[in-house]
Amino acid sequence: MAAPLKLISHKLCPYVQRAVIALTEEGVAFERIDIDLANKPDWFLAISPLGKTPVLQVGPTAIFESAVILEYLEETQPKPLHPSDALARAEHRGWIEFGSAVLNDVAGFYAAPDEATFNAKVSQLGQRFARLETRVAATPWFDGESFSLVDAVFGPVFRYFDVFDDIADFGILAEKPKLMRWRKALAARPSVRAAVSADYPVLLRDFIDRRNSWLSGLQARVAA
C-alpha cells in the first residue's frame, strides 16, 4: 500500500477502535488524527459524507464507514484477518454486524433516561451476550486460535464494561465464562490496548456524566 494513510478519529469512537486494531494487526503504518465530533472541522465534513468517524484517507481518496475500511484492508494486505474459507468469512461478517447491534444497545444503555428504560436495556444486552456465549470458541479468540476481525470488533465492546463495572455490577456478563475468557484475552492484546489513549476511562466517564441519563445519575451517586 504505497499511498500514505491517515485515520480520522475520535478518541471514544468504538468504530475507530476496530479500524485501529485491524491496521495494527496487519502492520500498516498510519497517522491518527483525532477530531471533536461536537465541533466538526470543515475539512472533515468535506471528506466524510455522513459526518462520522472513522475516515481512512488513502492519498487523495477518503474511505468512510468502518466496515468498508476493514474490507479494504482485507483486500490490500498480505495477512488478512478474515478466514480463508468463503462460508466462514460470510459467517464472520454476520457476527461483525451483530457486534454493531450490540454497540447500539450499549448506546441505549448509557443514554437511557429513566430506570425502566435502563433496566430494559440491561436485559437486552444480557440476551445479546447470552446468544454470543453460545457461539464464541472456548479458546482465546472468537473462532479459535486465530485473531480475526470479529475480535477487532468486540475488543471495543468489552472495553465499555471496564468503566461500567466501576459504577456497578449490572450482571450483564454474569455466568458467561467463555465471554469472560475472551474479554480478558482481548484486554491483554497489544493492538486492542493501543486502540485508545491512556485517558480513555476518564473521557468515557465524562461523556456519561454529560448524558443526563439514568446511568450518569448512578455514576454521580457512586462517586459522591
Regions found by a protein language model. Name each.
Residues E74-P78, S100, A137, F158, ...:
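Hydrophobic/aromatic-lined pockets within catalytic cores
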Residues C13, A152, L204:
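Functionally engaged cysteine thiol sites
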Residues F142-I167, I172-R181, A185-L186, V196:
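GST superfamily/GST-like fold recognition
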Residues D105-G108, I167, V192:
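Charged, solvent-exposed alpha-helical segments that act as regulatory interaction surfaces
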